[in-house]
């Protein structure tokens, strides 16, 4: 009887710990579930474009993580901090402003462009919910996200 209670309690602990980490059968075994999406932290550094491509190759419809709420970001921060500690990781946000149509204050279209090569990709801190502009070619850690497969 004691052994049965131990095993039952052990299974309950495993079940509760898995539900707390977001494990769900709709995600691949090493991905975590949250609100209809699957997430995976990658402990390797890549440029923004290489990380985005890598996420696309990992799972159909995969991409660098995006956030739709502070709760979602908190979930990702809880996953990343133990791995990356006080570092930054790529997020899917990218500033595509260079592709917009700009006009000078005198009404003339901007045909000549002399933009500096300042960063136009974004990273997230692992310590709080802040994003920073970062050089896209700088290798960083990253998190992939995908919709739950039906």
Swiss-Prot record:
<feature type="disulfide bond">
    <location>
        <begin position="55"/>
        <end position="144"/>
    </location>
</feature>
<dbReference type="InterPro" id="IPR016187">
    <property type="entry name" value="CTDL_fold"/>
</dbReference>
<dbReference type="GO" id="GO:0005576">
    <property type="term" value="C:extracellular region"/>
</dbReference>
<protein>
    <recommendedName>
        <fullName>Snaclec 7</fullName>
    </recommendedName>
</protein>
<dbReference type="InterPro" id="IPR001304">
    <property type="entry name" value="C-type_lectin-like"/>
</dbReference>
<feature type="signal peptide">
    <location>
        <begin position="1"/>
        <end position="23"/>
    </location>
</feature>
<comment type="similarity">
    <text>Belongs to the snaclec family.</text>
</comment>
<keyword id="KW-0964">Secreted</keyword>
<keyword id="KW-0800">Toxin</keyword>
<comment type="function">
    <text>Interferes with one step of hemostasis (modulation of platelet aggregation, or coagulation cascade, for example).</text>
</comment>
<keyword id="KW-1015">Disulfide bond</keyword>
<keyword id="KW-0732">Signal</keyword>
<dbReference type="Pfam" id="PF00059">
    <property type="entry name" value="Lectin_C"/>
</dbReference>
<dbReference type="GO" id="GO:0090729">
    <property type="term" value="F:toxin activity"/>
</dbReference>
<dbReference type="InterPro" id="IPR050111">
    <property type="entry name" value="C-type_lectin/snaclec_domain"/>
</dbReference>
<feature type="disulfide bond">
    <location>
        <begin position="27"/>
        <end position="38"/>
    </location>
</feature>
<keyword id="KW-1199">Hemostasis impairing toxin</keyword>
<feature type="disulfide bond">
    <location>
        <begin position="121"/>
        <end position="136"/>
    </location>
</feature>
<dbReference type="InterPro" id="IPR018378">
    <property type="entry name" value="C-type_lectin_CS"/>
</dbReference>
<feature type="domain" description="C-type lectin">
    <location>
        <begin position="34"/>
        <end position="145"/>
    </location>
</feature>
<comment type="subunit">
    <text>Heterodimer; disulfide-linked.</text>
</comment>
<dbReference type="InterPro" id="IPR016186">
    <property type="entry name" value="C-type_lectin-like/link_sf"/>
</dbReference>
